C-alpha cells in the first residue's frame, strides 16, 4: 500500500488511484478473513464491526475521485465491487444488483473468464440461485473454483445432496490447504444435515 501511495502521488492516473482504492478496501478486512488456525471466513460471515472503517472511507474517497475522471479501468471496477461489499452493514444488505452491473463492466474491460465466474455468484444473490446456476452453465467447467461456485449455488437452491457432493469434489481441486479445509467442512456440514 505504501508503494502504491507513492506511485499514486507520482502518477496522476485514475487506474493507479483505482489500484490504491482496491488495496485499501481489501486490506480493511484483513483481520476478519481468517479465524484461529488459519480457517477461512467467508465474506458473509466476517465480523464487519472489525473492518477498518477509516481505511474503507479512504478507499471509497479515492475511488470516487478516480471514477469522476470518466476513464474506467479494471482496478476501478474491482474497487467499486469491494466498496459495495464494504458499504453493506450486513451481508443481507449488500447491493448485489449493482455488484452484477460492475461485474458486467469488468467483464467487458478484461474478458477474463474468472470475472464471469465471480459474476455468477453475484447473479445468484441478486436474482436467485437458479439464475446464478444458469449463468454458470454458460462457462467452462474447468475454471478454477467453478465446482465450488456450483456447490454454493446448489446449496442456496436447497439441493443439499448435490451441493455436498460438489463441495467434496471442489476440495479435491483446492488451490491451498486453507481452501481445501474450508470446502471439506462445507461438505461435512451439509452431509450432517442430510442425516
What would you call each of these model-derived segments?
Residues 1-104:
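Amphipathic helix-loop-helix modules that constitute alpha-helical solenoid scaffolds
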Residues 4, 11, 70, 103, ...:
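Alpha-helical junction/boundary sensor with strong preference for TPR arrays
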Residues 8, 20, 100, 107, ...:
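Heptad-repeat amphipathic alpha-helical coiled-coil interaction surface used
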Residues 15, 74, 78, 114-115, ...:
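Start-of-helix register in tetratricopeptide repeats
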Residues 19, 23-26, 78, 82, ...:
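"A position-specific structural signal for the A-helix of alpha-solenoid helical repeats
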Residues 27, 90-93, 126, 157, ...:
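Structural motif corresponding to the intra-repeat A-B loop/turn of tetratricopeptide repeats
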Residues 40-52, 127, 134-137, 142-148, ...:
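Divalent-cation-assisted or electrostatically stabilized phosphate/pyrophosphate-binding catalytic cores
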Amino acid at each position: 500500500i505504501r508503494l502504491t501511495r507513492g506511485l499514486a502521488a507520482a502518477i496522476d492516473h485514475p487506474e493507479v488511484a483505482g489500484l490504491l482504492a482496491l488495496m485499501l478496501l481489501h486490506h480493511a478486512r484483513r483481520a476478519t478473513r481468517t479465524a484461529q488456525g488459519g480457517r477461512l471466513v467467508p465474506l458473509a460471515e466476517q465480523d464487519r464491526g472489525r473492518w477498518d472503517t477509516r481505511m474503507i472511507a479512504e478507499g471509497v474517497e479515492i475511488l470516487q475521485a478516480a471514477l469522476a475522471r470518466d476513464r474506467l479501468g479494471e482496478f476501478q471496477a474491482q474497487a467499486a465491487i469491494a466498496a459495495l461489499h464494504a458499504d453493506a452493514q450486513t451481508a443481507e444488505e449488500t447491493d448485489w444488483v449493482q455488484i452484477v452491473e460492475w461485474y458486467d463492466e469488468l467483464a467487458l474491460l478484461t474478458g477474463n473468464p474468472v470475472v464471469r465466474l465471480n459474476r455468477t455468484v453475484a447473479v445468484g444473490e441478486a436474482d436467485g440461485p437458479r439464475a446464478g446456476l444458469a449463468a454458470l452453465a454458460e462457462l467452462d467447467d474447468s475454471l478454477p473454483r467453478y465446482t465450488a461456485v456450483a456447490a454454493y449455488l446448489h446449496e442456496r437452491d436447497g439441493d443439499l445432496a448435490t451441493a455436498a457432493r460438489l463441495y467434496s469434489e471442489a476440495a479435491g481441486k483446492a488451490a491451498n490447504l486453507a481452501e481445501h479445509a474450508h470446502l471439506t467442512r462445507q461438505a461435512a456440514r451439509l452431509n450432517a444435515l442430510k442425516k
